[in-house]
Design a protein with these regions (language model features):
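Phosphate-binding glycine-rich loop
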Residues: 36-39, 43-90
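Conserved PLP-binding catalytic core of the aspartate aminotransferase-like
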Residues: 266, 278-307
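Active-site phosphate-binding strand-loop segment of PLP-dependent enzymes
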Residues: 119-184
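PLP-dependent aminotransferase class I/II
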Residues: 200-284
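PLP-dependent aminotransferase-like
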Residues: 77-143
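N-terminal "arm"/small-domain region of PLP-dependent enzymes with the aminotransferase-like
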Residues: 1-37, 52, 137
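Glycine/small-residue-rich loop that forms an oxyanion/phosphate-binding "nest" at active or ligand-binding sites
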Residues: 66-81, 155, 175-183, 187, ...
């Protein structure tokens, strides 16, 4: 009889179909011999590699148990900072977007304001700013760039002046989980603003997507050192496991895999976009490893057919 699989592919997880770098796999295997030791040295090596990659001092980097922990700690740190200063605080997010920042803010009893995307699915920066200006307190913006689920970028020439137009009473948490997949030259990492000295900009990234290490939980935050110091007060002290650390270092060093991950995603994206065009289905410009597209007919039926 023909073997069948009951495994369901969770497309909304945006996992990397390539799997991890072979060098990362070997690094994990090699780490078994030292699994009885704490990974302090390996954790330090990840920070050193990231600092070199982004051309910053190591004090700009904070590792997380996946970037979800970095997002949680950043949101919590900024909320507590505002509350300690006896200031009202709230989170402002585009809608739809990745919802972890929203969940963390709500868990702390902080109001969340959702600003609908513009008709073209881009961030409505005017309405986002209006939401902050209508509030007498501290505003934390969570901006996923490229955005999830639209996979669209916000160009630097638009985003950066907009951020700089705010007072220091507004903070910008830029989630760049999919930045390594971006092809559009209009994109520029928010780390540029951090390097310029802005203390109200925090950038998070992950090894889960581009480097296919989702199961090993390695992420990081990049911000000004004094901001990193404040955020790390809300982080676990032992948040990076040995296997994840050695895999992260090996992945950063494997330039061949990085090129393959980027190119294979670009090719796959184009194949899907061509198919959508042939089917007459509209889609948003994609810069991630997923595509936001039109569905004709009943959504529930579509979901059931995708599971079949």
């Amino acid at each position: 009889p023909k073997a069948t699989s009951t495994k369901v592919l969770h497309l909304n997880f945006n996992e990397n179909a390539l799997g991890m770098s072979e060098k990362a796999k070997q690094a994990i295997m090699n780490s078994l011999a030292i699994g009885s030791y704490y990974p302090d040295d390996q954790r330090a090596a990840v920070i050193t590699q990231l600092a070199a990659k982004h051309n910053v001092a190591e004090s700009f980097i904070s590792l997380g148990n996946g970037s979800s922990e970095n997002i949680q700690a950043a949101v919590q740190a900024l909320i507590v900072k505002a509350q300690n200063a006896k200031q009202a605080v709230r989170l402002v997010v585009p809608d739809p977007t990745f919802n972890y920042a929203e969940l963390y803010a709500k868990a702390l009893g902080v109001p969340v304001v959702k600003v609908p995307l513009a008709d073209d699915f881009s961030f409505d920066l005017t309405k986002l700013k209006n939401a902050a200006e209508a509030f007498d307190g501290v505003t934390i913006f969570y901006l996923c760039n490229p955005n999830n689920p639209t996979s669209m970028i916000t160009p630097a020439k638009t985003l950066f002046p907009w951020i700089k137009s705010f007072s220091q009473n507004s903070y910008f948490l830029l989630d760049e989980a999919y930045a390594d997949f971006v092809e559009d030259p209009a994109f520029e990492t928010g780390m540029t603003l951090v390097k310029e000295g802005l203390k109200n900009v925090l950038v998070t990234r992950t090894f889960s997507k581009f480097y296919a290490l989702a199961g090993y939980r390695v992420g990081y935050l990049l911000a000004q050192p004094e901001v990193v110091e404040e955020v790390e007060k809300f982080m676990s002290l032992d948040n990076t496991n040995l296997a994840g650390a050695v895999a992260a270092v090996a992945s950063l060093q494997d330039k061949t895999f990085a090129k393959l991950s980027f190119q294979s995603n670009a090719v796959s994206r184009q194949i899907v976009q061509n198919a959508l065009t042939e089917l007459g289905l509209k889609f948003a410009p994609s810069n991630g490893n997923f595509i936001f597209h039109e569905i004709k007919g009943d959504v529930k039926t579509y979901q059931e057919r995708m599971k079949a």
